[in-house]
Amino acid sequence: MDYLLKTEPSTYSFADLEREKATIWDGVSNPVALKNLARMKTGERLVIYHTGDEKRAVGTATVVSVDASDERNPQVKIKAGRPLTKPVTLADAKASDVFSESPLVRQGRLSVVPLNERQYRFLTGE
């Protein structure tokens, strides 16, 4: 499974991740988002999405390691991938049938969103 990780760029942006190369993804409090974090597996692909005024997918990353021994605070280390050649906006996703049943458009406050292969390809252009 692939995932989309939402972040407020003024707090932590994709550029920050690129500069640091890797980070522990934290600051998640929603119970569903925490469960999604805990389900992640090493090597899974991620899309980084900027919230706030941007509302767009901006880059890729990969899960490096997962420690879900504490389900209330899973520790997921991710490493930066590449910036997207063409960032995809929330409006683009909503206009596509690819996301009609996705939490990305149905649960706007969910910060860790599972993606199927088709959704991942739509966002990344791969």
Where is each model-derived feature located?
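Contiguous surface segments at macromolecular interaction interfaces
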Residues: M1-T11, S29, A68-E126
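Short, charged beta-turn/beta-strand-edge "cap" motif at the junction between a beta-strand
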Residues: Y49-K55
